[in-house]
């Protein structure tokens, strides 16, 4: 009886593993199609913050409010940054962005370039600067639509 129980137990494990392996591509396809609204998902007022390093200069920290219009454009209303202890505030910086159907994207804020991942409901953006010499990453959280 013990051998029979072990055989059926192993057979069930193998069946579940085969089912999971067969369904995995479908799950990935579903995940890749979560941002079908594309640019429209990135809409409203967001608070963004991040930390990192400017190579050869020192640490950097930023916080700001950005408005995304849902059409690939926006505006950084107010951004305060501290670079190696020197603080400055910038206002009204133009923003352009593209959201892909797999919820990845890219944006330009002024002269800075970023890659990001956005949640399917548009409530959270995780971003990283892609410009050479800057290691800076952070998040953006939607405050209101």
What are these regions, as identified by a protein language model?
Residues 2-15:
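Bacterial N-terminal signal peptides that target proteins for export
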Residues 3, 22-24:
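Post-cleavage N-terminal segment of exported redox proteins
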Residues 7, 26-27:
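A subset of signal/propeptide-processing and intrinsically disordered low-complexity segments
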Residues 15-22:
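Bacterial N-terminal signal peptides
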Residues 27-145:
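Mature soluble binding/inhibitory domains
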């Amino acid at each position: 009886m013990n051998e029979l129980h072990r055989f059926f137990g192993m057979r069930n494990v193998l069946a579940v593993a085969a089912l999971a392996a067969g369904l995995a591509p479908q799950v990935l396809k579903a995940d890749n199609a979560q941002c079908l609204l594309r640019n429209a998902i990135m809409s409203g007022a967001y608070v963004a913050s991040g930390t990192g390093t400017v190579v050869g200069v020192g640490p950097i920290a930023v916080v700001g409010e950005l408005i995304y219009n849902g059409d690939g454009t926006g505006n950084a209303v107010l951004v305060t940054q501290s670079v190696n202890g020197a603080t400055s505030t910038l206002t009204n910086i133009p923003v352009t962005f593209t959201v892909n159907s797999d919820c990845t994207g890219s944006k330009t804020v002024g002269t800075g370039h970023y890659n990001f991942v956005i949640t399917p409901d548009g409530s959270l953006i995780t971003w990283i600067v892609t410009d050479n010499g800057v290691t800076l990453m952070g998040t953006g959280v939607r405050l209101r639509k």
